[in-house]
């Protein structure tokens, strides 16, 4: 490895997705928790008209995102007992950019470390490692996936450099479980020198939010995204909600002109039409509950309940998990192999039917091979 490159990156594992040349041409993508349907054609036509009539391609984007921040603040205020100001909103090129800004603002250069509870979204630890920030990994109960709070407190007490940021996904991914009352109480009792980041990427599916706690906890920050329920994964729009002082610092450390104009316009358009878009969420949840019952009926599997748009299950003979992933991929269904199990995104009814048929065929094939 070249001497000008940091040596700890030589064996570093980046966030990975399957390469397109290794996949079948016709594929059901049930691995990234995207919404099963694209934006309606009518909304795409609205966006196209915006591009033609108002978007100046030779101009840099609005670096302050002010109209979008105002629109987001109005939306979040609908879920908050107190009004949320645009000054409490930061917008990023996906939540990933906001996570990186948080790390730059809090823990880089030996100033601090972070705490995560695994299994969880891997990008928290990945981005911290790319910045040379130590990552402390708390454990979860193997049956419920609730954080083992006593062990987490021990990590916090012993951490050097000190824990500056705790990342908590609500509900958690890949497991789909919401925060328990005990976990929320624990977060509320953490010292104010720890930034508590609550990632609500799946809020629109779970209906669970802690935005009402922000006023009482200036060291809390909530992350959300337009990539899931709002169907803008291709546009990469995430946002943070928090104390205006913290938001101002995040604005200082991010790149200028970080979000393309078209992405800003798209986010405003879907917010303007949110009632129609979010009205389809019950259909997704019904598909999730149906698949959960199917998976429960399968003796080879252990499936966990979920309040998000995905389900997590493990094989009772976990050594077969890699071959199951391969078999599903070869039949045309891509899922996420993670945390010793499989996470499957809730897709269209047709995709769910195909997944179930392919899963049964794969499990039957494994059973016959074992015999």
From Swiss-Prot:
EC number: 2.6.1.9
Catalyzed chemical reaction(s): L-histidinol phosphate + 2-oxoglutarate = 3-(imidazol-4-yl)-2-oxopropyl phosphate + L-glutamate
This protein's UniProt keywords: Amino-acid biosynthesis, Aminotransferase, Histidine biosynthesis, Pyridoxal phosphate, Transferase
GO biological-process terms attached to the record: L-histidine biosynthetic process
HAMAP family xrefs: HisC_aminotrans_2
Protein origin, superkingdom: Bacteria
Family, similarity comment: Belongs to the class-II pyridoxal-phosphate-dependent aminotransferase family. Histidinol-phosphate aminotransferase subfamily.
Cofactor(s) annotated in UniProt: pyridoxal 5'-phosphate
Modified positions (N6-(pyridoxal phosphate)lysine) in chain numbering: 228
UniProt entry tagged with the keyword Amino-acid biosynthesis: yes
GO molecular function annotation: histidinol-phosphate transaminase activity; pyridoxal phosphate binding
UniProt pathway annotation: Amino-acid biosynthesis; L-histidine biosynthesis; L-histidine from 5-phospho-alpha-D-ribose 1-diphosphate: step 7/9
Protein name: Histidinol-phosphate aminotransferase
Cross-referenced Pfam families: Aminotran_1_2
Subunit organization: Homodimer.
């Amino acid at each position: 490895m070249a001497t000008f490159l940091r040596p700890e990156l030589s064996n570093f594992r980046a966030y990975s997705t399957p390469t397109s040349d290794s996949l079948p041409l016709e594929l059901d993508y049930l691995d990234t928790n995207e919404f099963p349907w694209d934006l309606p054609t009518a909304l795409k036509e609205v966006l196209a008209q915006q591009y033609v009539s108002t978007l100046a391609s030779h101009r840099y984007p609005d670096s302050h995102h002010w109209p979008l921040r105002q629109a987001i603040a109005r939306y979040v205020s609908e879920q908050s007992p107190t009004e949320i100001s645009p000054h409490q909103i930061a917008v990023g090129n996906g939540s990933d950019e906001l996570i990186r800004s948080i790390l730059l603002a809090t823990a880089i250069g030996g100033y601090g470390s972070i705490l995560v509870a695994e299994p969880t979204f891997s990008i928290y630890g990945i981005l911290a490692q790319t910045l040379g920030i130590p990552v402390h990994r708390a454990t979860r109960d193997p049956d419920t996936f609730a954080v083992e709070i006593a062990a987490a407190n021990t990590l916090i007490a012993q951490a050097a450099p000190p824990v500056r940021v705790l990342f908590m996904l609500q509900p958690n991914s890949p497991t789909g479980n919401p925060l328990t009352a005990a976990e929320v109480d624990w977060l509320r009792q953490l010292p104010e020198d720890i930034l508590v980041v609550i990632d609500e990427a799946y809020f629109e599916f779970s209906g669970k939010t802690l935005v009402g706690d922000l006023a009482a906890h200036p060291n809390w920050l909530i992350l959300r995204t337009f990539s899931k329920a709002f169907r803008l994964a291709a546009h990469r729009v995430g946002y943070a909600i928090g104390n205006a002082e913290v938001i101002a610092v995040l604005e200082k450390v991010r790149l200028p002109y970080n979000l393309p104009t078209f992405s800003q316009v798209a986010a405003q358009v879907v917010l303007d039409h949110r009632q129609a878009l979010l009205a389809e969420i019950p259909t997704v949840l019904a598909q999730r509950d149906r698949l959960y019952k199917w998976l429960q009926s399968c003796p080879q599997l252990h499936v966990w309940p979920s309040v998000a748009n995905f389900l997590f299950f493990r094989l009772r003979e976990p050594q077969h998990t890699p071959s199951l992933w391969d078999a599903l991929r070869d039949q045309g269904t891509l899922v996420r192999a993670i945390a010793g199990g499989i996470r499957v995104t809730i897709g269209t009814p047709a995709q769910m039917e195909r997944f179930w048929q392919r899963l049964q065929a794969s499990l039957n094939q494994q059973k016959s091979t074992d015999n």
